[in-house]
């Protein structure tokens, strides 16, 4: 599943081709995605995309009269191609542009989405109650301590709640907790301010590094130019259950926590 770094890499890849460009045509081959693609998406035609932004894992194509909201779901990907490039299996939507390019959404598992809203993007029901972006100053140790106070929820589950902070998905929660030396099952409200400060710093470092490396390619994700992400080569714990910890050589434990695979070092993480 594409997480925040993968979505940000996609945003960076498509933005130069879309920003300041008029939409000439929207082709919906199969609109049966997570939510049906609305007929109103055709309102995008003849509008100029002024900005390609991201909120959590949503990509926002912003115009003066509305916003197209894209979500990649479990297996979605975007490509910038020349108009006329033949569609392949699972190529569900094309947004054709006045510069001769098109933005193509491919989604084998159909958990992605393409929505249209005339209201400000941040006011949309899917976005309005989300927590802060993890790479902004709004996400800091003081904020996290305030949200965690009195909470018995496991810290990993707590971090993956997008009402607390967006974009800290399973891969990066595993990696950040390992880097911070915090056991994933430790109660969120039972972590000192000093350790939370370390955790926040590691979340920011891990996410920024993943973006710089083009994301993590485990199965489905490739960037807008079709290239894989290389952060997989830097994973310390995720996907390595039963293998030796790189630091202390203890065999890494693998459990299910909040219905998600969780890998940690019982020696290094407390």
Swiss-Prot record:
Named cofactor requirement(s): Zn(2+)
InterPro entries: DNA_glyclase/AP_lyase_DNA-bd (IPR015886), DNA_glyclase_Znf_dom_DNA_BS (IPR015887), Formamido-pyr_DNA_Glyclase (IPR020629), FPG_cat (IPR012319), MutM-like_N-ter (IPR035937), Ribosomal_uS13-like_H2TH (IPR010979), Znf_DNA_glyclase/AP_lyase (IPR000214)
Superkingdom, taxonomy of origin: Bacteria
Positions that bind DNA: 90, 109, 151
Pfam family, one: Fapy_DNA_glyco
Catalysed reaction equations from the record: Hydrolysis of DNA containing ring-opened 7-methylguanine residues, releasing 2,6-diamino-4-hydroxy-5-(N-methyl)formamidopyrimidine; 2'-deoxyribonucleotide-(2'-deoxyribose 5'-phosphate)-2'-deoxyribonucleotide-DNA = a 3'-end 2'-deoxyribonucleotide-(2,3-dehydro-2,3-deoxyribose 5'-phosphate)-DNA + a 5'-end 5'-phospho-2'-deoxyribonucleoside-DNA + H(+)
Catalytic activity, EC: 3.2.2.23, 4.2.99.18
Keyword DNA repair: yes
SUPFAM superfamilies (alphabetical): Glucocorticoid receptor-like (DNA-binding domain), N-terminal domain of MutM-like DNA repair proteins, S13-like H2TH domain
Cofactor note: Binds 1 zinc ion per subunit.
Keywords from the UniProt entry: DNA damage, DNA repair, DNA-binding, Glycosidase, Hydrolase, Lyase, Metal-binding, Multifunctional enzyme, Zinc, Zinc-finger
GO molecular function list: 8-oxo-7,8-dihydroguanine DNA N-glycosylase activity; class I DNA-(apurinic or apyrimidinic site) endonuclease activity; damaged DNA binding; zinc ion binding
Active site: 2-3, 57, 260
Keyword DNA repair: yes
Chain positions of all zinc fingers (FPG-type): 236-270
GO biological process entries: base-excision repair
NCBIfam families the record matches: fpg (TIGR00577), PRK01103.1 (NF002211)
Purpose: Involved in base excision repair of DNA damaged by oxidation or by mutagenic agents. Acts as a DNA glycosylase that recognizes and removes damaged bases. Has a preference for oxidized purines, such as 7,8-dihydro-8-oxoguanine (8-oxoG). Has AP (apurinic/apyrimidinic) lyase activity and introduces nicks in the DNA strand. Cleaves the DNA backbone by beta-delta elimination to generate a single-strand break at the site of the removed base with both 3'- and 5'-phosphates.
Assembly and interaction partners: Monomer.
Family: Belongs to the FPG family.
Name of the protein in its database record: Formamidopyrimidine-DNA glycosylase
Organism field: Aeromonas salmonicida (strain A449)
């Amino acid at each position: 599943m594409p997480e925040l770094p993968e979505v940000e890499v996609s945003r960076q890849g498509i933005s130069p081709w879309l920003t300041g460009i008029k939409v000439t045509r929207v082709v919906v081959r199969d609109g049966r995605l997570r939510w049906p693609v609305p007929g109103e998406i055709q309102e995008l035609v003849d509008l100029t995309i002024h900005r390609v932004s991201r909120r959590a894992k949503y990509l926002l194509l912003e115009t003066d009269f509305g916003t197209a909201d894209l979500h990649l779901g479990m297996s979605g990907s975007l490509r910038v191609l020349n108009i006329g490039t033949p569609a392949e299996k699972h190529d569900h939507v094309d947004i054709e542009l006045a510069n001769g390019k098109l933005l193509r959404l491919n989604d084998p598992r159909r958990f992605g989405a393409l929505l249209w809203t005339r209201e400000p993007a941040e006011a949309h029901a899917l976005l309005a109650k989300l927590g802060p972006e993890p790479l902004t100053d709004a996400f800091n140790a003081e904020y996290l301590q305030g949200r965690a106070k009195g909470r018995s929820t496991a810290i990993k589950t707590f971090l993956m709640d997008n009402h607390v902070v967006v974009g800290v998905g399973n891969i990066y929660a595993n990696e950040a907790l390992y880097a911070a030396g915090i056991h994933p099952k430790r109660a969120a409200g039972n972590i000192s301010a000093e350790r939370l400060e370390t955790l926040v710093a590691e979340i920011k470092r891990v996410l920024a590094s993943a973006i710089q490396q083009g994301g993590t390619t485990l199965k489905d994700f490739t960037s807008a130019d079709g290239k894989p992400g290389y952060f997989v080569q830097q994973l310390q714990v995720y996907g390595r259950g039963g293998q030796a910890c790189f630091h202390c050589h203890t065999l890494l434990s693998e459990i299910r926590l909040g219905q998600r695979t969780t890998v940690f070092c019982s020696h290094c993480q407390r």
